[in-house]
């Protein structure tokens, strides 16, 4: 089976990005490894099962990269955070100070609201109307 394991998100600062994604969005810090060049390999994940797509938080190194922080998709929603309990996660994120750009709405495809991360990248918080048809990750504890 093939899957997208990581997506790179260029950030201003490793530690402030880790704080936002773990504290405000409830992600887990999967890896934070120093590299010989002084950079770090930092991965956060929205799930604890290790089967989702992680975010590689890459600190901007030059002006070109700094210019992309917060605008990696040209102002479009570029990231989609699925939930199985929209009201719970919306309330938790609101309490954590996440900036929502609109009121929650109910569409034919599910409950959705656009929010932005600490740098301004746009995300959808989405509870699909129809459960995800993809098979669930294997239950490794049953082996």
Task: For each feature predicted by the language model, list its residue ranges.
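Conserved beta-strand-loop-alpha-helix junction that forms the acyl-donor binding cleft
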Residues: 11-14, 35-37
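Vicinal oxygen chelate
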Residues: 1-6, 28-82, 88-118, 126-143
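Conserved active-site tyrosine of GNAT-family acetyltransferases
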Residues: 17-22, 93, 120
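Ser/Thr-centric signal marking residues that sit
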Residues: 8, 22, 83
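Conserved phosphate-binding and hydrolysis motifs of nucleotide-dependent enzymes
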Residues: 13, 117-120
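Helix N-cap motif at beta-to-alpha junctions
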Residues: 13-14, 84-86
């Amino acid at each position: 089976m093939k899957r997208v394991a990581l997506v790179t998100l260029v950030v201003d600062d490793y530690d402030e990005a880790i704080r936002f994604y773990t504290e405000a969005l409830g992600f887990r810090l999967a890896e934070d490894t120093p590299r010989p060049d002084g950079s770090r390999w930092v991965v956060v994940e929205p799930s604890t099962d290790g089967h989702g797509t992680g975010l590689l938080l890459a600190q901007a190194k030059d002006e070109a990269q700094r210019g992309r922080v917060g605008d990696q998709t040209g102002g479009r929603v570029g990231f989609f955070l699925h939930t199985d309990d929209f009201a719970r996660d919306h309330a938790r994120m609101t309490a954590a100070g996440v900036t929502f750009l609109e009121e929650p709405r109910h569409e034919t495809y599910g409950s959705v609201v656009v929010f932005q991360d600490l740098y301004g990248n746009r995300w959808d918080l989405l509870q699909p109307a129809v459960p995800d048809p993809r098979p669930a990750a294997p239950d490794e504890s049953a082996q």
